[in-house]
């Protein structure tokens, strides 16, 4: 994979984080969201691997869509069984992600260089990191999913001065700052943003 493709994929990951800001208010939600994202990604890879050996080329996208949606439904039911309260917050975002993947398969031609484990890894780490920082700043605690809701494992008085950074608007601003730093650090070695698009 070329450096250009990896660079562009990483930028798209940072932009995509903004869509999940409402669901990352707690580390418990962010953790389950990242796990769901990985389930979706690897089910798509499994479907593509199986379709190469057992199915025709024309049927492969349909098989991948069906397996991806099935994996999302199974993961949603699993969360509902173990963490019903957390599932109420995450359910829309899980299916939005699955729908986005389905539309991508149906409306665009597949590009093998457009997907990478690096991009998925960066996306997952940033989602988990943002949810962890938001909960620490806003509530002064770190939570894990539990059947009754959330299990707090660390708790201390939150700071009122920087609590704004944990709100939705503050998180979007923080993502913008991170993107600016990311782009500024690579200006000496990569073409401008306009030239990449």
From Swiss-Prot:
Keyword Ribonucleoprotein annotated: no
Name by which UniProt lists this protein: Uncharacterized protein TP_0149
Membrane topology summary: Multi-pass membrane protein
Stretches of the chain forming a coiled coil according to its record: none
This protein's UniProt keywords: Cell membrane, Membrane, Transmembrane, Transmembrane helix
Residue ranges of the TM segments: 12-41, 78-100, 120-142, 162-184
Main location (coarse class): membrane
Subcellular location: Cell membrane
Domain of life: Bacteria
Gene Ontology CC annotations of this record: plasma membrane
């Amino acid at each position: 994979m070329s450096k250009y493709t990896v660079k562009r994929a990483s930028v798209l990951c940072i932009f995509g984080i903004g869509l999940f800001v409402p669901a990352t208010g707690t580390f418990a939600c962010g953790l389950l969201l990242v796990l769901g994202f990985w389930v979706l990604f690897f089910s798509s890879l499994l479907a593509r691997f199986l379709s190469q050996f057992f199915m025709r080329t024309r049927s492969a996208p349909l098989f991948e869509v069906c397996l991806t949606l099935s994996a999302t439904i199974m993961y949603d039911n699993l969360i509902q069984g173990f963490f019903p309260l957390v599932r109420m917050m995450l359910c829309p975002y899980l299916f939005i992600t699955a729908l986005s993947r389905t539309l991508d398969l149906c409306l665009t031609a597949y590009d093998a260089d457009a997907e990478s484990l690096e991009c998925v890894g960066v996306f997952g780490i940033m989602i988990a990191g943002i949810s962890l920082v938001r909960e620490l700043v806003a509530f002064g605690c770190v939570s894990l999913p539990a059947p009754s809701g959330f299990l707090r494992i660390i708790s201390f008085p939150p700071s009122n001065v920087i609590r704004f950074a944990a709100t939705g608007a503050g998180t979007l601003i923080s993502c913008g700052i991170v993107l600016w730093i990311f782009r500024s650090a690579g200006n000496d070695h990569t073409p401008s943003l306009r030239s990449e698009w």
